[in-house]
Amino acid sequence: VNDKPTGAPRLAGIAREEDALVVDKSLIADEDGVGPYSVIWQRSSSKTDWQAFPDAVGEILPLTQSHVGYSYRAVVSYTDGHGTREILVTSPSETVINVDDPVEGEVVITGKPLEGGMLVANTERVFDEDGIASLSIGWESSKYGRNWQAIETTSTSRFDLSQSMVGRQIRARVSVVDTFGVETVIFSQATNTVKNVNNKPAGKILVRRVGS
């Protein structure tokens, strides 16, 4: 007569990105003997509808960004000494929580710092493993590259250089909000000082005759 196993496997570890879940089988006992264990993993976003997670193999589940938002459980099976296959399931883990990943990459400014010219802030190299929900660009200027002031007249990736920017350095300020609502602000490298372009005088010279 088959003897049912006593005890149950359980999950150890913290359900958090960059940590790991480990199957603890130390409490499992079977009077018919315990053969080699096999472990498969399942996951669910609701702890009700479980799906096989074939990406994970073995007793340790390292938690990465792709695991965030899911709960996991392990299905442990073995064949006892009389050839009966036994299946045990752990209680589900807590939902794996996110750990904020830093924004990577850089903002690159193209264009010449010259009056009448245009600078463009390129954000194609900006990356966040947590995903990017929104990205906004602002511009700042500084006389000596130390105290930076926001330029309120523009909030696009393009910035036209007017006479008022001559003698100042320019940089782009980029606000990145990830899909978990965390905001990170990064800056481009500052440009060289914006150079002046000579503006021709306007108007005419009038010669008036004075006296007789």
What are these regions (language model features)?
Residues 1-212:
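Ser/Thr/Pro/Gly-rich low-complexity disordered regions
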